[in-house]
């Protein structure tokens, strides 16, 4: 598929990098990015409760992935992932699933304080792989990382740096 012609809003730039997540298709129509909702919880340790774990815990409960990330004051538990348009409100079902799964892995979390429920939208591609590369001679894309955005940030930064330095020139093949 040949990508559409794109005129960057900043015309004096030599190269434009599209890194605007779920809204990338607004700047490059046809880019196969869709929003996927994700929820996480922050659980605060309370006096008398079992201590915060010392390491990240990853598990699978009832076919769902759950992770527990230790923080100074408690644990971040996550995460859901499902198609729900552009809704960014935490849903009771998502919160319940995370709590059930987290407590199945570490039952003592049931006594922690539920400090925060948060939801956001992740840019996802049809094949689940990020789009990082040239779209045309003046436009790079760095989007579609899904739930692994923070994890892949160092790789993406290095890849974009290499592309800008001219070390790699192949164009992204869009489905």
For each of these PLM feature ranges, what is it?
Residues 1-2, 15, 39:
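Generic beta-strand structural signal
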Residues 22-137:
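Active-site substrate-recognition segment that forms the wall
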Residues 108-175:
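C-terminal catalytic lobe of FAD-dependent flavoproteins
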Residues 8, 77, 140-142:
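Generic recognition of long tandem-repeat/solenoid scaffolds
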Residues 11-23, 157:
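Short hydrophobic core segments
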Residues 1-10:
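A conserved short coil-to-beta-strand element within the FAD-binding core of flavoproteins
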């Amino acid at each position: 598929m040949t990508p559409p012609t794109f005129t960057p809003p900043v015309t004096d730039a030599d190269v434009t990098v599209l890194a605007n997540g779920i809204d990338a298709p607004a700047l490059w129509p046809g880019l196969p990015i869709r929003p996927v909702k994700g929820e996480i919880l922050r659980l605060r340790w309370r006096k008398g409760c079992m201590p915060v774990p010392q390491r990240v815990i990853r598990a699978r409960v009832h076919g769902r992935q759950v992770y527990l990330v230790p923080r100074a004051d408690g644990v971040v538990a996550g995460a859901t992932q499902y198609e729900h348009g552009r809704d960014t409100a935490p849903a009771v079902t998502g919160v319940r699933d995370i709590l059930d799964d987290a407590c199945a892995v570490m039952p003592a979390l049931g006594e922690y304080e539920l400090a925060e429920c948060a939801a956001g939208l992740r840019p996802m591609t049809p094949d689940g792989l990020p789009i990082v590369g040239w779209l045309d001679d003046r436009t790079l894309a760095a989007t579609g990382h899904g739930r692994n955005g923070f994890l892949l940030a160092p790789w993406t930064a290095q890849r974009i740096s290499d592309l800008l330095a001219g070390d790699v020139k192949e164009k992204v093949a869009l489905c």
